[in-house]
Amino acid sequence: SFYLIPNYTAVENVALTLELNNFKNPEKEAKLLLDRFGLSHRFNNLPSQLSGGEQQRVAIARAIAMKPELILADEPTGNLDSENSSMIADILFNFAKEEGSSLIIVTHDSKLANRAKRKIKIKDGKID
């Protein structure tokens, strides 16, 4: 579950965060973000009408909508195919660089981990 509001469309799920924080054009901003995630054709779909990967992308868009200083991402590409995994990784790393945000990713995906500036491995519950 990505904690999307079931009776809100993809745009509404992302725009809500922006509305609550007094953004001037929350729907426009939400659409721009969702378009970056390849979801322009899903703007008006409810979460139940989205695949797991699409739901995950909406949730990530919602999470970065407020341009946080710290992004904590637990398996951000876990439910995605390789093409969408690459896109999400690009968006997260580019966003962190552009906005000056710190990005912490927990992943089993070595390709994703290798993109990080610093890696910490945990093996058998201990830092390796």
Where are each of the predicted segments found?
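Conserved switch/coupling elements of ABC/ABC-like ATPase nucleotide-binding domains
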Residues: 124-128
